[in-house]
């Protein structure tokens, strides 16, 4: 139903956000980030 689709969309957004943050911190560890 509608509720399940909404939950799926939110989960997708959250996953994308978390993955992005993980990638950023990984890049920082590898290349050494400068603020």
UniProtKB/Swiss-Prot annotation:
Checking Pfam families in the record gives: Antimicrobial_2
What are the disulphide bonds in this sequence?
28-33
Q: Does the keyword Disulfide bond apply?
A: yes
Q: Name one GO cellular component term.
A: extracellular region
Expression by tissue, per the entry, reads: Expressed by the skin glands.
Coarse class of the protein's main subcellular location: secreted
Compartment(s) where it occurs, according to its Swiss-Prot or TrEMBL record: Secreted
* Keywords of the record: Amphibian defense peptide, Antibiotic, Antimicrobial, Disulfide bond, Fungicide, Secreted
Gene Ontology biological-process annotations: defense response to fungus; defense response to Gram-negative bacterium; killing of cells of another organism
Q: Which family does it belong to?
A: Belongs to the frog skin active peptide (FSAP) family. Ranatuerin subfamily.
Role according to the record = Antibacterial activity against Gram-positive bacterium S.aureus. Shows no detectable hemolytic activity towards human erythrocytes.
- Mind telling me what this protein is named? Ranatuerin-2SPb
């Amino acid at each position: 139903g509608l509720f399940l689709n909404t939950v799926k969309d939110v989960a997708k957004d959250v996953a994308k956000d978390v993955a992005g943050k993980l990638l950023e911190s990984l890049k920082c560890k590898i290349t050494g980030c400068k603020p």
